[in-house]
């Protein structure tokens, strides 16, 4: 469902609803949009669907999804993606909406940071707590070296081949990448502020086994200085209790996790309270007609940050969005059990 469609300011992709966010609520919204006869496009800053479920706790259990006694966040996302398949909603991943401008007739023109544009009758913001951005290393020299010697993600592991790599962090991503890079790097050292980790038991066990076998090093401490006297990174000073240690390093991979950031949403002219979008409780519409919010980003009295609540909010929001997409057409409600068109679509992908 990942889209390769291109668009420009002069030739935007036209859709009934633009869904901002590909987390569980955004994915269910895409399915629900198809059920009631709305076309949609999905945009998300992360390069894979799933939102914070995938980025923060992919293997943690979830117990409060109706009729699903237990599943991991990864399982839930996989099921929601599968549920969308009958409508094949295009997903524009790895980019975020930078601008949102009103058009004549009540429609909206949205622009992403990659130059893609969308002409939508309604906007449904299901962005969780906002876009996720890497938590950066708080050293002045880190900003100067970012992109060449300091990295917050790995786009091509072979780009680190033959180098001394220091990986900073203690979560699943840090441990998994430190272990994976053994196959291409000259040497790998993992640096974490304490001896314990916030990673799965299996990842921790693999790490300790690799260190014991001499396949990589693990150093407890915090990065205090990046040494690059003639340009390239040469070494990293790690502060420890009672002293410090200097590590040879050509490349630094910082995996301190992700932090939520509303980003450009705050500039869209919609009412925001405590970092969330204020909505009514009839259709979860914001202070600007045609812009809706569902999921954790929605703010209203007695709001519960539950995935199932987000499903409900998105469902109602889309029914109001239908009126913006088809102002002269009355929507006829049909229970899914008696929806022949839906049954045909589902049968086509799940024979």
Swiss-Prot record:
It catalyses: 2 reduced [2Fe-2S]-[ferredoxin] + NADP(+) + H(+) = 2 oxidized [2Fe-2S]-[ferredoxin] + NADPH. It comes from the Bacteria. Its EC number is 1.18.1.2. Gene3D superfamilies: FAD/NAD(P)-binding domain (3.50.50.60). InterPro entries: FAD/NAD-bd_sf (IPR036188), FAD/NAD-binding_dom (IPR023753), Fd--NADP_Rdtase_type_2 (IPR022890), Ferredoxin-NADP_redctase_2 (IPR050097). Keywords: FAD, Flavoprotein, NADP, Oxidoreductase. It is an enzyme of class 1 (oxidoreductase). Its cofactor is FAD. FAD binds at residues 44, 52, 57, 97, 132, 296, 337. One of its GO terms (molecular function) is ferredoxin-NADP+ reductase activity. Belongs to the ferredoxin--NADP reductase type 2 family. HAMAP family: FENR2. Homodimer. This is Ferredoxin--NADP reductase. It comes from Burkholderia vietnamiensis (strain G4 / LMG 22486) (Burkholderia cepacia (strain R1808)). The lineage of its organism: Bacteria, Pseudomonadati, Pseudomonadota, Betaproteobacteria, Burkholderiales.
């Amino acid at each position: 469902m990942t889209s390769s469609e291109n668009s420009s300011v002069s030739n935007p992709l036209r859709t009934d609803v633009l869904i901002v966010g590909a987390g569980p609520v955004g994915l269910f919204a895409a399915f629900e949009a198809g059920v009631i006869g709305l076309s949609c496009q999905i945009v998300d800053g992360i390069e894979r669907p799933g939102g914070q479920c995938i980025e923060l706790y992919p293997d943690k259990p979830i117990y409060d999804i109706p009729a699903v006694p237990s599943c991991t966040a990864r399982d839930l996302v996989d099921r929601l993606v599968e549920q969308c398949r009958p409508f094949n909603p295009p997903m524009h991943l790895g980019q975020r909406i930078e601008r949102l401008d009103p058009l004549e007739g009540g429609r909206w023109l949205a622009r992403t940071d990659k130059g893609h544009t969308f002409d939508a009758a309604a906007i449904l913001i299901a962005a969780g707590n906002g876009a996720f951005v890497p938590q950066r290393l708080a050293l002045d020299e880190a900003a100067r070296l970012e992109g060449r010697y300091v990295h917050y993600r790995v786009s091509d592991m072979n780009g680190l081949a033959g180098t001394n790599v220091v990986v900073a962090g203690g979560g699943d991503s840090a441990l998994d990448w430190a272990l994976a890079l053994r196959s291409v790097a000259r040497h790998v050292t993992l640096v974490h502020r304490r001896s314990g980790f916030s990673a799965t038991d299996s990842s921790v066990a693999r790490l300790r086994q690799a260190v014991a076998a001499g396949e990589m090093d693990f150093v407890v401490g915090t990065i205090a200085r990046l040494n690059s006297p003639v340009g390239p990174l040469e070494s990293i000073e790690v502060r420890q209790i009672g002293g410090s240690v200097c590590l040879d390093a050509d490349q630094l991979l910082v995996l301190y996790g992700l932090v939520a950031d509303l980003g450009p949403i705050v500039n869209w002219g919609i009412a925001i309270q405590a970092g969330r979008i204020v909505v009514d409780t009839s259709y979860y519409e914001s202070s600007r007609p045609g812009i809706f919010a569902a999921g954790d980003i929605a703010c209203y009295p007695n709001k519960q940050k539950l995935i199932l609540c987000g499903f409900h909010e998105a469902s109602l929001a889309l029914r109001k969005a239908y009126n913006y997409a088809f102002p002269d057409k009355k929507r006829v409600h049909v229970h899914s059990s008696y929806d022949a068109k839906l049954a045909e679509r589902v049968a086509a992908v799940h024979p």
